[in-house]
């Protein structure tokens, strides 16, 4: 690092499918958290001099969502629209953090088992468009484990676009046992939109989907026993809650509150053939060496926004206990700040002195090209 230690602070940017979390290494929380959306007007502007733009990013897109079509450039953890992604990064550096990217090493995050081209293109844009001096791409779940202060454990990271299980032993990720499930928060929002329609509330536009996401975040929970909860909901109104829509209309939601996140445990609800998150966790542990399974069972770390439902830790405990050997000690770790634990782990990693030789420098990139990212990043 140069003399200007302060100027060279690394930037940590966890670009999730739903939210971008960004800030400076060494901080204990991200400075900027905003939706990874780009909105474009769906109407013709008529007021001259309003300074209307052809696109809006993040919170501004959210606040004007009534007149915009919102698009998320990251789907299931994979960047599908690079032009919009560039807008989001530009917004992150210049508007949210107010820094010049050419002065700061930048740590980005990625879901495991992503297409290789995805991280190559990320590397290319960082060096060629934003001229960063150095960068690194880290696996999200590994960072969550850092944040929990462990070196061994199995992380279930579930965000808006993708859920994955990554077993890590003494700091080494075990790639053969990584499980990825393309079922996460956005699918739950879509499912909630669908089951609310059955109740007679229609939500269709991209803006209305954001309202449903808010309902999901405020009112949904995971039932400990799904069948029993369904029976309770059918026989009484004790589980019903009301929600006021932006136009003042009040809607009531009952068993939808737990039917929505139940999809994580029963993906067949949305027509997916996959096993639920409890089973993928168990299968992932079973793919690991018999000697380390005990340590993994005792360190089940939850991370990401879709693990924030009340009741999810107890339910995981119950489901994994049912699958595991009867004498096994099973512990689910659900840190309160798990929504941001990927970012926090990145902040810890990027400020370690031992990490400084891991950065991909501009010079290395110029010599080897984008494929350098596979050699230097796990």
Swiss-Prot record:
Q: Under what name is this protein listed? A: Actin, muscle 1A
Against SUPFAM superfamilies, the record matches this protein to: Actin-like ATPase domain (SSF53067)
Gene3D superfamilies from the UniProt entry: 3.30.420.40, Actin, Chain A, domain 4
Reading the lineage from the top rank, the first entry is: Eukaryota
Q: What class of enzyme is it?
A: hydrolase
One GO CC term on file: cytoskeleton
Could you tell me the keywords of this UniProt record?
A: ATP-binding, Cytoplasm, Cytoskeleton, Hydrolase, Muscle protein, Nucleotide-binding
Its localization reads:
Cytoplasm, Cytoskeleton
Q: Which Pfam families match?
A: Actin (PF00022)
Organism listed in the record: Halocynthia roretzi (Sea squirt)
Q: Which GO terms describe its molecular function?
A: ATP binding; hydrolase activity
* Gene name for this UniProt entry: MA1A
InterPro entries for the chain: Actin (IPR004000), Actin/actin-like_CS (IPR020902), Actin_CS (IPR004001), ATPase_NBD (IPR043129)
Entry annotated with the keyword ATP-binding: yes
Q: Which family does it belong to?
A: Belongs to the actin family.
Which CDD domains does this chain map to? ASKHA_NBD_actin
E.C. no: 3.6.4.-
Q: What does this protein do?
A: Actins are highly conserved proteins that are involved in various types of cell motility and are ubiquitously expressed in all eukaryotic cells.
């Amino acid at each position: 690092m140069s003399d200007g230690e302060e100027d060279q602070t690394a930037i940590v940017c966890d670009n999730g499918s739903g939210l971008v979390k960004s800030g400076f290494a060494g901080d204990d929380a991200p400075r900027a958290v905003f939706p990874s959306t780009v909105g474009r007007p769906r109407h013709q502007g008529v007021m001259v001099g309003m300074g209307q733009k052809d696109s809006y990013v993040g919170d501004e897109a959210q606040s004007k969502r009534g007149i915009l079509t919102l698009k998320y450039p990251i789907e299931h953890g994979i960047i599908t629209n690079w032009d919009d992604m560039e807008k989001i990064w530009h917004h992150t550096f210049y508007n949210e953090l107010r820094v010049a990217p050419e002065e700061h090493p930048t740590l980005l995050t990625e879901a495991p088992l992503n297409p290789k081209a995805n991280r190559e293109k990320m590397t290319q844009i960082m060096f060629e468009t934003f001229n960063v001096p150095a960068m690194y791409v880290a696996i999200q779940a590994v960072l969550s484990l850092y944040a929990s202060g462990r070196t061994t454990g199995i992380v279930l990271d579930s965000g808006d676009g993708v859920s994955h299980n990554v077993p890590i032993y003494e700091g080494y990720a075990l790639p053969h046992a990584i499980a990825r499930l393309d079922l996460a928060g956005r699918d739950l929002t879509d499912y909630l939109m669908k089951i609310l329609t059955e109740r007679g509330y229609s939500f269709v536009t991209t803006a209305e989907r954001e309202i449903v996401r808010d309902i999901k975040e405020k009112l949904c929970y995971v039932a400990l026993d799904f069948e029993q909860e369904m029976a309770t909901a059918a026989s009484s109104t004790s589980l019903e809650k009301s929600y006021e829509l932006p136009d003042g209309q009040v809607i009531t939601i009952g068993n939808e509150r737990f039917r929505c996140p139940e999809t994580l445990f029963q993906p067949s609800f949305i027509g997916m053939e996959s096993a639920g998150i409890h089973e993928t966790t168990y299968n992932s542990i079973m793919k690991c060496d018999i000697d380390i399974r005990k340590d993994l069972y005792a360190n089940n770390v939850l991370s990401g926004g879709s693990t924030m439902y009340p009741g999810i830790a107890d339910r995981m405990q119950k489901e994994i206990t049912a699958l595991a050997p009867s004498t096994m000690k099973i512990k689910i770790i659900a840190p309160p700040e798990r929504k941001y634990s990927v970012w926090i782990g990145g902040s810890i990693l990027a400020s370690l002195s031992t990490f400084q030789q891991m950065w991909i420098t501009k010079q290395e990139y110029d010599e080897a090209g984008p494929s350098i990212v596979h050699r230097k990043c796990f």
